[in-house]
């Protein structure tokens, strides 16, 4: 990929950076990782192939199959019908908090992000959203 946005939509890059970094979080999609020669080399060996049987399952499912061929000739494979985070496999509250904090803390102080997360998780219980919006506005100044 030519930039971080393209990296986020590149299956070869996403697979390669996840394998190299053992993580698919926001840190795996930075400029540093886009330029990482190990990630680039591995991504160049990824082949994306449509499987009509899997495509036919859409839109009810979002299936995928991954096959990894090792240098010693062994083959590792796995298949899923859903993406993590779908209604079939929802994120836990702990996972949502971790993801929110990892993204928010790139822009705002960690303490503020923790407070904001807690407020957002109860937004449906607020009688008045104006204090929350004012807090966000103040952080943007």
Predicted regions and their residues:
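Terminal-appendage/accessory-domain detector
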Residues: 1-141
